[in-house]
């Protein structure tokens, strides 16, 4: 099973993982800003876009077979969980890790800010009733009244949506994150309702070796709402 990739530009390989409900087309508005410096590699995650459903191990093997030996890796939201796991398990391949409004754990608990578990349970339960309505509600939550130009791309499969929600609800890399020694940056939006800005303060304390950037006026999509600042941060981070 092949992972669907799209490639643009030349230079340092930069692999981009999208978030839940979208496919790799979400990155299209920023490709013109990135491709003069990087070889952009857009990836459709399992069950999204043109990539079929598959488990983590199958995804990792197939993806690494198609990627350069070394690359920078950026993940947005759910894509940040995929990116973090790949960086933990394949440190010889991943040179830089960029997590965009992502977190090592998305569900809140007594000492960790995040989304209440019942929110994901409701999204999961509503998928079987009305996929389009559920997607629109999730997109509205991400935007938090911000205006962004984005492309939905190919409709996600029901299996991909369900698997993605399972990942958002169960993957937890807070302990394994301490293993990461490659250059790593976390980007947060102060108005983000999904990855709360409170997460940043906790992570700065627990993982002081990472870099942190706060977009004061951004919600969950800073790469689209504040593209110029996002590109500047990327260029300064990836040497």
From Swiss-Prot:
Disulfide bonds: none annotated. Pfam families: Abhydrolase_1 (PF00561). Its EC number is 3.1.1.85. GO terms for cellular component: cytoplasm; membrane. It comes from the Bacteria. SUPFAM superfamilies: alpha/beta-Hydrolases. This is Pimeloyl-[acyl-carrier protein] methyl ester esterase. Belongs to the AB hydrolase superfamily. Carboxylesterase BioH family. The physiological role of BioH is to remove the methyl group introduced by BioC when the pimeloyl moiety is complete. It allows to synthesize pimeloyl-ACP via the fatty acid synthetic pathway through the hydrolysis of the ester bonds of pimeloyl-ACP esters. The active site is at 77 (nucleophile), 192, 220. Its main location: cytoplasm. It catalyses: 6-carboxyhexanoyl-[ACP] methyl ester + H2O = 6-carboxyhexanoyl-[ACP] + methanol + H(+). One of its GO terms (biological process) is biotin biosynthetic process. Substrate binds at residues 20, 77-78, 138-142, 220. It is found in: Cytoplasm. The lineage of its organism: Bacteria, Pseudomonadati, Pseudomonadota, Gammaproteobacteria, Legionellales. Keywords: Biotin biosynthesis, Cytoplasm, Hydrolase, Serine esterase. Pathway: Cofactor biosynthesis; biotin biosynthesis. Monomer. One of its GO terms (molecular function) is pimelyl-[acyl-carrier protein] methyl ester esterase activity. The gene is bioH.
